[in-house]
UniProtKB/Swiss-Prot annotation:
Pfam family, one: Ribosomal_L27
GO cellular-component term (any): cytosolic large ribosomal subunit
Family statement: Belongs to the bacterial ribosomal protein bL27 family.
Keywords from the UniProt entry: Ribonucleoprotein, Ribosomal protein
Keyword Nucleotidyltransferase applies: no
Gene Ontology molecular functions: structural constituent of ribosome
One GO BP annotation of this record: translation
Top-level taxon in the UniProt lineage: Bacteria
NCBIfam families: L27
Key word Membrane present: no
Gene label: rpmA
Region ranges (Disordered): 1-21
Official protein name in the record: Large ribosomal subunit protein bL27
Amino acid sequence: MAHKKGASSSRNGRDSNPKYLGVKRFGGQVVKAGEIIVRQRGTKFHPGLNVGRGGDDTLFALSAGTVEFGRTRNRKTVSIVPAEA
């Protein structure tokens, strides 16, 4: 049996907290203004029509409507199709 802990075992044992990233509202879902659509690191999804981007690259709805995922050139985009009044 070893009487010392070993070179690295006492330096291990940490884990970061979960960040809860990902798509929060899927295509076809109805959203209100200000609702978060995607939480992400970097721009995996780019903002489209009626979608804003926060400082941490979070995409959120600027107006009420239906979420729509699509492609523009080689980018994945998220747009909001306004609800017809």
